[in-house]
Each structure stands twice: as C-alpha cells, then as structure tokens.
Amino acid sequence: MVTQSTYDELKNKYGTVASWTLWCPAEDTKKSNTENLSVFQNPDLLEKLNAKYVFVALNAANHPNFQTKPAWSCFHSGYRYQNDYKLRAATQGTRFEGAYITDIIKYYVETDSSKVKSAIKKDPEIIVNNLKYFQEELELLKSSNNGMNPVLIALGNDAYNLLNKHITGYTIKNVRHYAGYFSDVWYKQHFVDTLSDI
C-alpha cells in the first residue's frame, strides 16, 4: 500500500516521467491494453500499489514531449512495437505488481544507451542532477514502506551499474531489460529465477 500523500506528491512531481507496474489485463492480443490508464482510476488503487520494490530503467527511450502526456503513461505504451507488455506479463499477479517504476536519468530522451553513457561521461552533471530527483522518489516511497528502503530492481546492466556506483544503503537486483529479444513467457520465468531471493 502507498499513502495518499505519497501518491499525490509522486504524481505531481514525477507523474509524467514514472509509473507503476499496474496494467489493465490483455484482451485480444498480448500487447493489447498496455496503454489503458483506467487502472489508475480504481477506487482501491492505493491498496494495489507497492512501495517495497522500485524498478529502475536507464532513461526515457522515447516520448520527447513527455510533459504533455497523462500521468503514469510512461511504461504504458500503445505503440505496436512496444515491449511494455512483457513487463506486465512478468509482474502481473506477483509480489512485484503495483511497484513503482522510473528512470534513473529522467530528462534525457535517447533510445541508444551507449549515447546516454557517453553523454554522462562528457557531462557528469547529468547524473548528479538526475540523482537528486531519483533520491527524492526513493525517500517518498520509503515513507510508505514503514521507513524501510525499497529494493531496487534494475532493468538492464546499464541501470544496474549506475545504481551500484551512485546509490548506497539499498538492496539492488538486476533483471534483463524487457526490450530484449525474448518472449513474455521467458521473461516471466526470468523474474522467478532471478528474484527468488527477495
């Protein structure tokens, strides 16, 4: 569960650059309904949200006009080639359903992770500035987790390496990024195999 005050503050500050691992069920195809945000209108929403885990990707891969997007629409794409459905498959019905999901680099839109790493190397202020936002998110979630640090689950090695380099005092796990060339069934089992100890 997440408190109303935590939810409201996260939504107001980070609703356009983060979300929760909560989706409407698929309908006619595996990719269907990932963009349906009506799940966030559920009157029992706060009970379904989970401050124990935070999924962390590297940076926003698309949506340069993210400020105009509805709250929580990140990681909920309706694009025909999206892979968000794999993350839905891996988390739905598990203890990871309803967890917070965000990017460690929020305001640098780029699909090529090597370019992101190069930009950080050239301008360390990118990571310094973004870490302030990320740490604020973690503190807000901590307040809804009995004062305990949430477990951080990196989505891919790039996010994992940044977390290990810059974040201390947290359990940090690593899973494959959902954009990889594998099925949703494989990805769900990957979660089971990789995250069984948390």
Feature locations, PLM:
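Alpha-helix capping/helix-boundary segments
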Residues: 158-160
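A polyanion-binding, active-site-adjacent surface
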Residues: 2-150, 166
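Short, aromatic/basic amphipathic alpha-helical patches
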Residues: 163-169
